[in-house]
Curated annotation (Swiss-Prot):
<dbReference type="GO" id="GO:0004096">
    <property type="term" value="F:catalase activity"/>
</dbReference>
<keyword id="KW-0376">Hydrogen peroxide</keyword>
<dbReference type="InterPro" id="IPR019794">
    <property type="entry name" value="Peroxidases_AS"/>
</dbReference>
<dbReference type="GO" id="GO:0020037">
    <property type="term" value="F:heme binding"/>
</dbReference>
<comment type="subunit">
    <text>Homodimer or homotetramer.</text>
</comment>
<feature type="binding site" description="axial binding residue">
    <location>
        <position position="261"/>
    </location>
    <ligand>
        <name>heme b</name>
    </ligand>
</feature>
<dbReference type="GO" id="GO:0042744">
    <property type="term" value="P:hydrogen peroxide catabolic process"/>
</dbReference>
<dbReference type="Pfam" id="PF00141">
    <property type="entry name" value="peroxidase"/>
</dbReference>
<keyword id="KW-0560">Oxidoreductase</keyword>
<keyword id="KW-0408">Iron</keyword>
<dbReference type="InterPro" id="IPR000763">
    <property type="entry name" value="Catalase_peroxidase"/>
</dbReference>
<dbReference type="GO" id="GO:0005829">
    <property type="term" value="C:cytosol"/>
</dbReference>
<feature type="cross-link" description="Tryptophyl-tyrosyl-methioninium (Trp-Tyr) (with M-246)">
    <location>
        <begin position="92"/>
        <end position="220"/>
    </location>
</feature>
<comment type="similarity">
    <text>Belongs to the peroxidase family. Peroxidase/catalase subfamily.</text>
</comment>
<keyword id="KW-0479">Metal-binding</keyword>
<feature type="cross-link" description="Tryptophyl-tyrosyl-methioninium (Tyr-Met) (with W-92)">
    <location>
        <begin position="220"/>
        <end position="246"/>
    </location>
</feature>
<dbReference type="InterPro" id="IPR010255">
    <property type="entry name" value="Haem_peroxidase_sf"/>
</dbReference>
Length: 732
């Protein structure tokens, strides 16, 4: 380092310097396809979390958690001598980021300990909750993830205060870097109201999809009311909408709010100006802790978190009907907390309903409610539900237990992923149940014979590939929903989706069902094949045929064991959110969106857990297999369709072709002979992306080389197999 220099020479990634995205803001972000790699994971490639969790003494962990609840620490004293309320909030906020629109968020990855969630305003002081848990995490190490421990701590908090939970399942594996594919909103200001630039609201308070929170940095709603307006009825609209986007109906919503607010208190002892920076902005000596407060002691009775101050009911560390009793018993006056936040205090409170101070037993306070809380009384939808619960404690307790379990397990996927001795035996509709295998599975000879029958049925390569893909592509790695298992493509709503080409689908399924019935009726040893398996097998057979057409021999991997779900096991409304509005792999776009077709492709690839090379080879294969929606010619850059060749890449990168937008459709392009002007090909933005984007073009060049034919086939088969088995957690 030169003695006159201001700093040593470091790369621009260490500090400063313009990134590619800074220079070209519209550049496609492919980095989201390469998150959570082994390079960021300290556990190593061979680490098997499920195996480690099965070694865990869950009862011992729970015993330690119960002890922690009342082991108040001087550096962060427990309210009422019990940390239960804090840990319930931690678990709730870990799970509450889930949104059903894209399945992202939720408790399943332990992301609350990473940016941005660790520094969201709504997560203020939850860093203290995780630090309180650290001795237990340290004790049990790799056998319990942070993701599981945070949820378990919430359960133990409830149980230690007298509530009977519905159950607990482990199996959440931690991530080790922020989940950068999650869109939290476009605002550039924490808690920006809807009148600010880049608002998530449009029209008559229409919330942008897939967002499920009303402001940047909140989990659900603003407790003070919409944009801070203390209107309980208006707040009811926000409460219903945000909880619905997290897959909760109004009854579950009331149960969660009333049940969760039975415990603990809010903190707003003084002005927010006393509160220091969040963890990600805090100085290095803070060691990852944020929101250091200069108000009084900065803790205990002087704590500032949400700005709202007080408890909802007497006895905040005990499960009872106090919340609903107080909600309906009293009239409420609007006040401002010591921090300046809108809240409501009960009027003319009976002595029995006064709340003892959380840190000074000589003081008592009136119960408080937030504006959002009062929506449970005054909203025309939520109010009657809350009133009914107030008169039926057993129904309320059962509803809260089930809703809490759903809240904390919604993003875990099928029950086959659940681990531990406290997994509930009851099958729930929101778990997308699939029957257990109850018959002998087909073997290698059966598979070969069935493939021959399928290929002789009159169904084309493209029809078989399209149907198998349509069945499997609903899978979302975010919340582990969808996929080919269950054969729900034959059920409502999937059988009616435009992208699944209902008329063709009906024809294909009829022929496959005929083959299935004939095979099953011919067996005498209990052996059967499901339609779910046969749909996937049809795709495998078609790809093998296409490879043979190209001169390559080989077998596409196939593992039987899928089962057929029933319509009764399928919540049609819940599955509606899985409908692809865009699927670049089938060159399908339902309508023009504000998001580009290529961005939608990357998002779909991410949900399918594909890398950029996997996405690239998959697109190239699907195009030459003629597997476009509506048999569209766009992107079918080959003169020999249904033949598994690298023609897509060869012809896309041919400098003898010049591309220009088609006059009739600005989303379609024409590729014409550079010399004669004759039309050679047509393609979409998705197709041309692989010649336009420098990173994807580099990958496309690999597959366009003369010696790449066999590699292309092998790589395509590998990624096809990955997608077909994405939901086969039983194979793990």
């Amino acid at each position: 380092m030169d003695k006159d220099s201001k700093r040593p020479v470091v790369g621009s990634t260490v500090r400063g310097g313009m990134s590619n995205r800074d220079w070209w803001p519209n550049q496609l972000n492919l980095s989201i396809l390469h998150q959570q790699s082994n390079k960021s994971n300290p556990m190593g490639e061979d680490f098997d979390y499920a195996k480690e969790f099965k070694k865990l003494n869950l009862a011992a962990v729970k015993k330690d958690l119960y002890a922690l609840m009342t082991d108040s620490q001087e550096w962060w004293p427990a309210d009422y001598g019990h940390y239960g309320g804090l840990f319930i909030r931690m678990a709730w906020h870990s799970a509450g980021t889930y949104r059903m629109g894209d399945g992202r968020g939720g408790a399943g990855s332990g992301s609350q300990r990473l940016a941005p969630l660790n520094s969201w305003p709504d997560n203020a002081n939850l860093d203290k909750a995780r630090r309180l848990l650290w001795p237990i995490k340290k004790k049990y190490g790799k056998r319990i993830s942070w993701a599981d421990l945070m949820v378990l701590a919430g359960n133990c908090a409830l149980e230690s205060m007298g509530f009977k939970t519905f159950g607990f399942a482990g199996g959440r594996e931690d991530v080790w870097e922020p989940e950068t594919d999650i869109y939290w909103g476009a605002e550039e200001e924490w808690l920006a109201t809807s009148d600010k630039p880049k608002s998530r609201y449009s029209g008559d308070r229409d919330l942008e999809n897939p967002l499920a929170a009303v402001q940047m940095g909140l989990i659900y709603v603003n407790p003070e009311g919409p944009d801070g307006n203390p209107d309980p009825v208006a707040a009811g609209y926000d409460v219903i909408e945000t909880f619905a986007r997290m897959a909760m109906d109004p009854e579950e919503t009331v149960a969660l709010v009333a049940g969760g607010h039975t415990f603990g208190k809010c903190h707003g002892a003084g002005p927010a100006s006393h509160v220091g920076p969040e963890p990600e902005a805090a100085p290095i000596e803070a060691q990852g802790l944020g929101w250091k407060s200069s108000f009084g002691t900065g803790k205990g009775g002087d704590t500032i978190t949400s700005g709202i101050e007080g408890a909802w009911k007497p006895y905040p560390t005990r499960w009872d009907m106090g919340y609903l009793k107080v909600l309906f018993k009293y009239e409420w006056e609007l006040v401002k907390s010591p921090a300046g936040a809108y809240q409501w205090l009960a009027m003319d409170v009976d002595e029995e309903d006064m709340v003892i101070d959380a840190h000074d037993p000589s003081k008592k306070h009136r119960p408080m409610m937030t504006t959002a809380d009062l929506s449970l009384r005054f909203d025309p939808v939520l109010g009657p539900i809350a009133k009914r619960f107030s008169k039926n404690p057993k129904a309320f307790a059962d509803a809260f237990a089930r809703a809490w379990f759903k809240l904390t397990h919604r993003d875990m996927g099928p029950r086959s992923r659940y681990l531990g001795p406290e997994v509930p035996k009851k099958e729930l509709i929101w778990q997308d149940p699939v029957p257990a295998v109850n018959h002998k599975l087909i073997g290698a000879r059966d598979i070969a014979a069935l493939k021959r029958e399928i290929l002789a049925s009159g169904l084309s390569v493209s029809q078989l590939v399209y149907t198998a893909w349509s069945s499997a592509v609903t899978f979302r790695g975010s919340d582990k929903r969808g996929g080919a298992n269950g054969a729900r493509i034959r059920l409502a709503p999937q059988k009616e989706w435009e992208v699944n080409q209902p008329a063709q689908l009906k024809k294909v399924l009829a022929k496959l069902e005929k083959i299935r019935r004939a095979f099953n009726s011919a067996q005498s040893d209990g052996k059967k094949v499901s339609l779910a398996d046969l749909i996937v097998l049809g795709g495998c057979a078609a790809i093998e045929q296409a490879a043979r057409n190209a001169g390559y021999k080989g077998t596409v991997p196939f593992k039987p064991g899928r089962m057929d779900a029933t319509q009764k096991q399928t919540d049609a409304a819940s599955f509606a959110v899985l409908e692809p509005l865009a699927d670049g792999f089938r060159n399908y776009l339902k309508a023009k969106f504000t998001v580009s077709a290529e961005e939608l492709l990357i998002d779909k690839a991410r949900l399918l857990t594909l890398t950029a090379p996997e996405m690239t080879v998959l697109i190239g294969g699907m195009r030459v297999l003629n597997a476009n929606y509506g048999q569209s010619p766009h992107g079918v850059f080959t003169k020999r369709p249904e033949t598994l060749t690298n023609d897509f890449f060869v012809n896309l990168l041919d400098m003898g072709t010049v591309w220009n937008p088609a006059k009739a459709d600005d989303c379609v392009f024409e590729g014409r002979d550079r010399q004669t002007g004759a039309l050679r090909w047509t393609g979409t933005r998705v197709d041309l992306l692989f010649g336009s984007n420098s990173q994807l073009r580099a990958i496309a060049e690999v597959y366009a080389c003369k010696d790449a034919g066999e590699k292309f086939v092998n790589d395509f088969v590998a990624v096809w197999n990955k997608v077909m088995n994405a939901d086969r957690f039983d194979l793990a």
